[in-house]
Amino acid sequence: MFKKNNMVIIDAHSHLWLRQDTSWDGKPIRSLKNGRSIFLGEEVQMMPPFMIDSQNSAEVFLSNIDYAQVGAAVVVQEFIDGLQNDYLVTVQKQYPDRFLCCGMPDYRQPGFFAQAEELILQRGFRGIAIPGHRLLGKPLTDDEMMRMFRLMEQKDVVLSITLEDGDRQVGELAEVSSECPRLRIAID
């Protein structure tokens, strides 16, 4: 592990995937080659062109953070990358000292708590990611979210959340932290 002045530098927001194959708002997001992707229907350069297979794999990421003398990384998820739980659970097992990987249930579906419970209890994720800016108005304080936060607090699972613009979710997150005072929350 790299240390600088006896401190370990941690990348607190990173993404890994073997391929992007999803859609958002009815528009496709797909990996191509040479770091290019179809993103919301438009071909764009998503990654450096030397990443010819368009994978942002743990091994490629580790080579970059090793070069930058970064000791570890928190891996979050985003709907626009597609759910990466299957890949990230293997990364977490293979590199437990280098990555804290966050699982992500599909919050857009009713009954997502069962997915969250599986990610935490059976698959062993140490964090859960919420792309709050993509919840389409769903409150952080709804019953299912609060059940998930209570489970996370009980199992000492970190919440990594990106908040939407404005202050609505700030107040909601204050309610969450009041109800679950031992829940560890990382906001980006």
Predicted regions and their residues:
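Short, well-structured secondary-structure segments
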Residues: 61-64, 69-91, 96-106, 129
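Hydrophobic faces of well-ordered beta-strands that scaffold small-molecule active sites
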Residues: 10-14, 73-76, 100-103, 126-130, ...
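Acidic-and-aromatic substrate-binding clefts and catalytic sites of carbohydrate-active enzymes
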Residues: 52-54, 77-84, 106-112, 135-141, ...
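Catalytic alpha-helical scaffold of carbohydrate-active enzymes acting on polysaccharides/glycoconjugates
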Residues: 2, 57, 84-94, 111-123
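Catalytic pocket-lining loop regions of alpha/beta-barrel enzymes
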Residues: 126-127, 139-188
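Substrate-binding cleft of extracellular glycoside hydrolase catalytic domains
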Residues: 100-136
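An N-terminally biased module of ancient metal coordination in phosphate/nucleic-acid-related enzymes
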Residues: 1-77
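Conserved, mostly hydrophobic/aromatic
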Residues: 13, 65, 88, 119, ...
